[in-house]
C-alpha cells in the first residue's frame, strides 16, 4: 500500500528508531520552548540536560547525534545559548577535536602491527589467567598512548577473525554465515563453539576494562582527559604524575580482579580456549606467517618505529596531540605505500561521527554556562570541607558518567571548577586536586555500563557481540566486579591518599608548587 507524504516523513524521521523514542523526541522539542518562555529558563535548561543524557543512554536505539543535535539546535533558536558561546567552547577544546580527527585516523594505519601483536599474544600464552592479564595489561598500556576506541577495535578484529576461522571449520563451509550455526552437525563441535564464545567474551571484557585502567592515566587516554589537562595547563608527564596517587593503586587492583575472576570462575569468566580451536587457529596463523611477503614485514617494522616515535613525542610534548597524530598519518601512509585518497578516507570513518557528537556536547555545555545550571550543585559541593569536596566531585562525576557519556560529564564539571577558581571560591592547589577527582571520577565508575565508556559501547554495537552472545545485561554483569573495586578504591584514594601523596611529590621535586 502506498504511504502518504506525512507517513513517509514520520518513517524517515530518525530512521529505524522505535516509534515511542521518536515520539519522545518530538515531545521534548514541543515542551522545551513552552517551559523556557512560560515557566522558568532554569528549569527548561535542566530539562534539556536530562533529555540529552537520555539520548546518550538510548545510544543503541539511535546514535545520539541526531536527537541530541535537534535538541541543541532548538536550544540556540529559542535563546538558551548563542552560536558565539558554542563557537567559544569549540575553540577552547580544539585540541580534543584534533585528537579525535587525526590521532584516531593515525592509529588506523598502525592496525596491522596491533593485529599482529594481539594474535601472537593469544596463541603463545596457554594459561588463561596469564592471557587475561596480558590482554588487560596490553590494552591498558596501549590506551595510555593511543585512543581506547582504536585499541578495542583491534581486539574486536582479532576476535572476529578467530571466530570466523573456527566457525568455518566447524560448519565445513568456506563462507558460512557467522550467525548461522545450522551447518554445524556435531554436538561436540557445538559445545566447543559455546566454550569458545565464553572464552572470547571474557577476553573482550578484560580488554575493555584494560582500556579504562590505562586510559585514565594520561592526557591522551580518553578525550575528556585532554579537556581536563587543558583547563589545568598540565603536559603529558605532569598529568600522569598528578593522577598516579589514584590511578596506580586502581590499576593494580584491576589486574588483581582480572586474575581472581578467572581463578575462581566468577561473573561469567574462567572459560578456557578449547584445544581443538587452538589447533585450528595455530595452523591458520602458521600458514599466514609463511605467506607474509618481505613488503608486509617491512610495513610491520615501519609501524613499530612509528609507535616508538608516537610514545616519545607524547611523553616529551613535542607538539599538540592532534599534530602528532597527523605526523603518524603522514609517516605511516608514506612508508607503507598508502597513497590513494579513497584508502585514506577509511581511516577517518571511525572518529568523525563521535567528533560531530562532541561538538553537540559543547553546545549543551554552552547552555549550562549561559543558564548557570550547575551553580546550585557547585555551591553545595564548595560549602563542604576541602577533603569532602574531592569525594563529592568524584561521586557526582562517577554517578553521571555511569549513565551518560564521560566526555560530556568531565567537560561540564571541569568548566564549573575553573569558574569557582576564577571567582576566588577555591585555591589553585584545591582546583588541581579537584581536577584529579573529576578525571578519575569520570573514568573509573563509568565501566559500570556501556553508556559510560565509548569503548564498551563500540564493543556492544560491533558485529562481534551477537556472535559471542555479549548482550547489554551480560556486559553490566561481567563488569560488576571491576566496577565495585575500581570505584571504591578510587574513592578511598581521592579521600585519603591524593592530598598527602601530592604534597610528597612536591617535596621530592617531581611536580612544581602552584
Swiss-Prot record:
Its main location: membrane. The keyword Iron-sulfur does not apply. It is found in: Cell inner membrane. It comes from the Bacteria. The keyword Cell membrane applies. It catalyses: 2 Na(+)(in) + 3 H(+)(out) = 2 Na(+)(out) + 3 H(+)(in). It holds the Pfam family NhaB. NCBIfam families: NhaB (TIGR00774), PRK09547.1 (NF007093). The chain crosses the membrane at residues 13-33, 34-54, 96-116, 136-156, 203-223, 236-256, 304-324, 349-369, 392-412, 448-468, 479-499. Na(+)/H(+) antiporter that extrudes sodium in exchange for external protons. It is a multi-pass membrane protein. Keywords: Antiport, Cell inner membrane, Cell membrane, Ion transport, Membrane, Sodium, Sodium transport, Transmembrane, Transmembrane helix, Transport. Belongs to the NhaB Na(+)/H(+) (TC 2.A.34) antiporter family. GO terms for cellular component: plasma membrane. This is Na(+)/H(+) antiporter NhaB. It comes from Proteus mirabilis (strain HI4320). GO terms for molecular function: sodium:proton antiporter activity.
Amino acid at each position: 500500500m502506498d504511504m502518504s507524504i506525512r507517513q513517509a516523513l514520520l518513517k524517515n524521521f530518525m530512521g529505524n528508531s522505535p516509534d515511542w523514542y521518536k515520539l519522545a523526541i518530538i515531545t521534548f522539542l514541543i515542551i522545551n520552548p513552552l517551559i523556557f518562555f512560560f515557566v522558568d529558563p532554569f528549569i527548561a535548561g535542566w530539562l534539556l540536560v536530562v533529555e540529552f543524557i537520555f539520548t546518550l543512554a538510548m545510544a543503541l536505539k539511535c546514535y545520539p547525534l541526531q536527537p541530541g543535535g535537534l535538541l541543541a539546535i532548538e536550544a540556540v533558536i529559542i535563546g538558551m545559548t548563542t552560536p558565539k558561546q558554542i563557537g567559544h567552547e569549540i575553540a577552547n577544546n580544539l585540541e580534543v577535536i584534533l585528537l579525535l580527527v587525526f590521532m584516531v585516523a593515525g592509529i588506523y594505519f598502525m592496525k596491522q602491527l596491533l593485529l599482529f601483536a594481539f594474535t601472537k599474544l593469544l596463541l603463545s600464552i596457554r594459561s588463561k589467567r596469564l592471557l587475561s592479564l596480558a590482554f588487560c595489561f596490553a590494552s591498558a598500556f596501549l590506551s595510555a598512548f593511543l585512543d581506547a576506541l582504536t585499541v578495542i577495535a583491534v581486539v574486536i578484529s582479532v576476535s572476529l577473525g578467530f571466530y570466523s576461522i573456527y566457525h568455518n571449520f566447524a560448519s565445513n563451509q568456506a563462507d558460512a554465515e557467522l550467525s548461522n550455526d545450522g551447518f554445524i552437525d556435531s554436538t561436540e563441535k557445538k559445545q566447543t563453539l559455546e566454550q569458545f564464545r565464553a572464552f572470547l567474551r571474557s577476553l573482550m571484557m578484560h580488554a575493555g576494562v584494560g582500556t579504562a585502567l590505562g586510559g585514565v592515566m594520561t592526557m591522551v587516554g580518553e578525550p575528556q582527559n585532554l579537556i581536563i589537562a587543558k583547563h589545568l595547563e598540565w603536559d603529558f608527564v605532569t598529568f600522569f604524575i598528578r593522577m598516579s596517587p589514584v590511578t596506580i593503586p586502581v590499576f593494580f587492583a584491576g589486574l588483581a580482579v582480572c586474575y581472581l575472576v578467572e581463578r575462581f570462575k566468577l561473573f561469567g569468566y574462567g572459560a578456557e580456549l578449547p584445544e581443538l580451536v587452538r589447533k585450528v587457529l595455530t595452523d591458520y596463523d602458521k600458514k599466514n606467517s609463511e605467506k607474509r611477503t618481505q613488503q608486509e614485514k617491512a610495513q610491520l617494522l615501519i609501524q613499530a618505529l612509528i609507535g616508538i616515535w608516537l610514545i616519545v613525542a607524547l611523553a616529551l610534548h613535542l607538539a599538540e596531540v592532534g599534530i602528532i597524530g597527523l605526523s603518524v598519518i603522514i609517516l605511516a601512509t608514506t612508508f607503507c605505500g598508502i597513497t590513494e585518497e579513497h584508502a585514506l578516507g577509511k581511516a577517518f570513518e571511525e572518529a568523525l561521527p563521535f567528533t560531530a557528537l562532541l561538538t553537540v556536547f559543547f553546545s549543551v555545555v554552552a547552555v549550562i554556562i549561559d543558564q548557570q545550571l550547575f551553580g546550585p550543585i557547585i555551591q553545595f559541593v564548595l560549602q563542604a570541607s576541602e577533603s569532602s569536596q574531592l569525594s563529592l566531585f568524584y561521586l557526582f562525576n562517577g554517578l553521571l558518567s555511569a549513565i551518560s557519556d564521560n566526555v560530556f560529564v568531565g567537560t561540564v564539571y571541569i568548566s564549573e571548577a575553573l569558574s569557582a577558581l576564577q571567582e576566588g571560591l577555591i585555591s589553585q592547589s584545591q582546583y588541581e586536586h579537584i581536577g584529579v577527582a573529576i578525571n578519575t571520577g569520570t573514568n573509573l565508575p563509568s565501566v559500570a555500563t556501556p553508556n559510560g565508556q565509548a569503548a564498551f559501547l563500540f564493543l556492544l554495537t560491533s558485529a562481534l557481540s551477537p556472535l559471542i552472545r555479549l548482550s547489554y545485561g551480560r556486559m553490566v554483569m561481567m563488569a560488576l566486579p571491576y566496577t565495585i573495586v575500581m570505584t571504591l578504591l578510587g574513592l578511598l584514594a581521592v579521600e585519603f591518599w591524593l592530598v598527602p601523596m601530592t604534597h610528597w611529590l612536591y617535596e621530592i621535586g617531581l611536580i612544581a608548587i602552584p
